[in-house]
Regions:
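ATP/NTP phosphate-donor binding region
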Residues: 1-61, 71, 113-117, 346-348
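Glycine-rich beta-strand-to-loop/alpha-helix junction loops that act as flexible
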Residues: 10, 64-66, 87-91
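Catalytic core of DAGKc-family lipid kinases
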Residues: 31, 79-83, 87-228
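Glycine-rich phosphate/pyrophosphate-binding beta-alpha loops
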Residues: 170, 174, 228-244, 322
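ATP/nucleoside-binding phosphotransfer catalytic cores, i.e., glycine-rich phosphate-binding loops
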Residues: 17, 215-222, 242-348
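Glycine-rich beta-alpha junction loops
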Residues: 10, 134-136, 169-173, 233-235, ...
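Short Gly/Thr/Asp-enriched flexible loops that form oxyanion-binding sites at enzyme active sites
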Residues: 69-82
Length: 348
């Protein structure tokens, strides 16, 4: 009987993950798996558990949760030959979506059996990841300081922190929204309405500031950072927003979206097109291209790129967590992890 190790975040979706796990577990056993469950207890715990399992005899290590849990488990397995499976019961589930795995609809999971079937007979794909380095974001009374994980490797610059991205890296209005959410702003509002309220607050509170960007081996350029940028290996993030339309995990590079110099009205107006994937080219200010390396810095008083962080702080999301700030660097590395997904995946 094949053994499967499942790593569950019991706090995902305010505890709904535990209830849905109660449906998944018997389905896994019925499929012929010997199930071993590991519950996480604190941020980064899933990475530690996954790393300890990376050389074990389990057929597959399964992340049970959303994109945050997937990120932690993938970080722990990265560089090994152990296969990562996904049972998506978080709020975003974009990495599962990119691998053709069925996802929940609200609080219901109509094709839960389909997700289990992929664990049994899905296709294993070897994919890359981005190494991301920058200063760690400072904590908040409701957010602990991000911690260094030895499995991520050491930074090249003293005081920096390293994370690996399997889904996407973004900054701008999107990371400001995520940071405010984590700080507990509008916590009495639930669902998509909360993100709408956070987005409006972030946009109207946005202060224009320049930024310097260097893509691959091209000369650096200065932009007005009113908007966002996103380096992604998948088509969607934020729970289905098609931010980098056409991207897929086995493409062998990142898809870089840049939306700079937007007015506050344009930032509000772009949210609908972002969800549908019809935003590229709008107002002549939104572009998308392939890239494998990116540097982002503030601009000093002399008009040159600076080693200082932006002021006010520009947070950088790595797979949905606002853990870093500028100056930031990222580089794509091939052959980092094996993912079990559907026989065919979107855009491949």
């Amino acid at each position: 009987m094949p053994r499967v190790a499942c790593i569950l975040n019991p706090n995902a979706r305010d505890g709904l993950s535990v209830k849905q796990w109660g449906q998944f577990e018997p389905a896994l056993r019925l499929a012929g798996f010997e199930v071993e469950l590991h519950n996480t207890q604190y941020p980064g715990h899933a990475t530690e558990i996954a790393h300890s399992l990376s050389s074990g005899d389990h057929e597959i290590v399964v992340a049970v949760g959303g994109d945050g849990t997937v990120h932690e488990v993938a970080s722990g397995l990265r560089g090994s030959n152990k296969v990562l499976g996904i049972l998506p019961i978080g709020s975003g589930n974009d990495y599962a979506r990119a691998h053709g795995i069925p996802t929940p609809k609200g609080n219901k999971f109509p094709d839960m059996q389909g997700a289990v079937d992929i664990l049994v007979s899905g296709v294993d794909r070897r994919v890359g990841a981005f190494r991301v380095e920058g200063p760690p974001a400072k904590g908040h009374k409701s957010i602990p300081d991000p911690e260094h994980h030895s499995v991520d490797g050491e930074p090249e610059v003293s005081g920096n922190m390293v994370r690996w991205s399997f889904l996407e890296i973004d900054s701008g209005v999107t990371s400001a929204v995520n940071r405010m959410k984590n700080e507990g702003k509008f916590k009495w509002i639930r669902g998509q309405l909360k993100y709408t309220a956070l987005g409006i607050r972030a946009i109207f509170g946005w202060r224009n500031q320049p930024g310097w960007i260097k893509i691959d081996d091209e000369p650096g350029q200065i932009f007005n950072f009113s908007g966002l940028f996103c380096m992604s290996q998948c088509q969607t993030f934020g729970g289905g927003f098609k931010v980098t339309p056409g991207a897929y995990p086995t493409q062998g590079h990142g898809s870089l979206l840049m939306a700079f110099g937007l007015s506050k009205l344009q930032m509000l107006m772009v949210m609908g097109p972002l969800e549908k994937g019809t935003h590229v080219g709008k107002w002549g200010k939104i572009s998308m291209r392939n890239a494998t390396r990116l540097e982002v810095r503030a601009v000093g008083g002399d008009g040159e790129p600076s080693n200082d962080s932006h002021n006010p702080t520009m947070f950088v999301n790595v797979d949905g967590e606002a853990v870093l700030t500028t100056p930031i660097s990222m580089a794509y590395h091939e052959d980092q992890i094996s993912i079990r997904g559907a026989a065919s995946i979107p855009n491949e």
